[in-house]
Regions:
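Pyridoxal 5′-phosphate
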Residues: 2-380
């Protein structure tokens, strides 16, 4: 912090105080902050560019930061091996196929998804995963597509596939000022599912806009009323652990770079095997088929994940996923979550205490004004 700037700001706003004094007050208010000190040591060893370039990085939703150790481990793997296209069967390709399958297992293990129950499908990003579900879901004129006001635009975009097939589209509103879902409205809408029809309910575990964390209990409630559930966890999993042995949506979408920064260009769809059988691809591509003929219209898709992975995977990047997952495990979700929520609580209180000279609040926060049922995103 520049002392001169601090002096100017303190005189003009009365808000910024001496850093050391404020930090001592902060630690007295949040003694548990010291239990996350491992992150400070990790910052020195694995994220040195932050200090070298005088950066403060607070994004736990749009893009995570990759660590130096992640890059080194991935580059060492590539530099010491020869990997070929996994769609072939030569020694280099078989070596890559083995790594791809190891990565799938690591992903399912990380999210505690039973491999007998779930498949792991790699895509280009979370939006690609959502599009895959939207274009393949068997909507009919008897179907409902139910979603919430605070979904990501890529979830909103599925309504275009829905509309083209004549299905009904309904939104669940959020209640101001906390922006939680209107539970009465949601319960009412969930009762509207036509038995035996294909009904899809999509909602975010954490709102990309407000940081609200919606109850994952809605997954089981919706399924008990005849809905398939699409859960967007892209904003949730960077700082919260998702356990698919406890919560069992049909489709789960995310991007890995939001979790640990690297690699970009790889997303994930985790789908129940039974739910995957329900999807019907509107086309086929290289890598997804076992047989296709130019003399007729017949073609046969691969079973399981391979039938949904168009073309050649970003295969050289895939081993970096297991490295990134191991990195998160080494830090610990508990530590990450604790650090983020302490900082979020502090910031919410500070923002709420800034007033105009007439006493009225300067800042309007959209979403929860406490850390109950919320993540680190603050909309104002």
């Amino acid at each position: 912090m520049n002392p001169k700037n601090s002096e100017i700001n303190e005189k003009s706003t009365g808000y910024l105080k001496d850093y050391a004094e404020e930090y001592e007050i902060f630690l007295n208010e949040y003694p548990d902050f010291m239990t996350t000190s491992a992150i400070d040591e990790l910052r020195k060893s694995d994220y040195p560019n932050l200090d070298r370039q005088n950066h403060i990085y607070l994004d736990y939703t749009g893009a995570g930061l990759f660590s130096i150790s992640q890059i080194r481990k991935h580059h060492e793997l590539l530099a010491s091996n020869i990997f070929g296209n996994p769609h072939s069967s030569n020694p280099t390709s078989l070596a890559m196929t083995k790594l791809v399958e190891r990565t799938r297992k690591a992903v399912l293990d990380f999210f505690k998804a039973d491999p007998e129950e779930y498949d792991c499908i790699f895509t280009c990003n979370a939006s690609g995963s959502l599009k895959l579900v939207g274009e393949s879901y068997p909507f009919t004129t008897n179907s409902h597509y139910l979603l919430t006001y605070d979904n990501h635009n890529s979830v909103n975009g599925i309504r275009e596939f829905t509309r083209a097939k004549g299905a009904k589209i309904n939104y669940i509103s959020v209640l101001s000022p906390q922006l939680h879902l209107d539970q009465n409205e949601l319960n009412c809408q969930l009762e509207q599912a036509i038995p035996g029809a294909n009904n899809l309910f999509a909602f975010p575990a954490q709102s990309n806009f407000s940081g609200v964390q919606h109850s994952l209990d809605w997954v089981d409630i919706a399924k008990s009323k005849g809905w398939d559930v699409l859960l967007d966890v892209a904003a949730f999993v960077p700082t919260n652990k998702l356990d698919l042995s406890l919560v069992k949506p049909d489709y789960v979408c995310l991007s890995f770079y939001k979790m640990f920064g690297y690699p970009t260009g790889v997303g994930l769809l985790i789908a129940k095997k039974e739910a995957l059988k329900k999807l019907h691809r509107p086309w086929f591509a290289g890598g997804t088929i076992t047989v296709a003929s130019v003399k007729g219209d017949k073609y046969y898709l691969h079973q399981g994940a391979e039938g949904f992975e168009d073309g050649t995977l970003n295969y050289l990047s895939l081993p970096a996923i297991e490295i990134g997952l191991n990195h998160i495990n080494s830090v610990g979700y508990e530590v990450i979550h604790q650090r983020v929520m302490i900082l979020t609580d502090w910031l919410l209180k500070k923002l709420s205490n800034i007033h105009h000279s007439n006493g009225s609040k300067l800042i309007q926060i959209y979403g929860p004004d406490t850390i109950e049922s919320r993540g680190g995103t603050i909309a104002l």
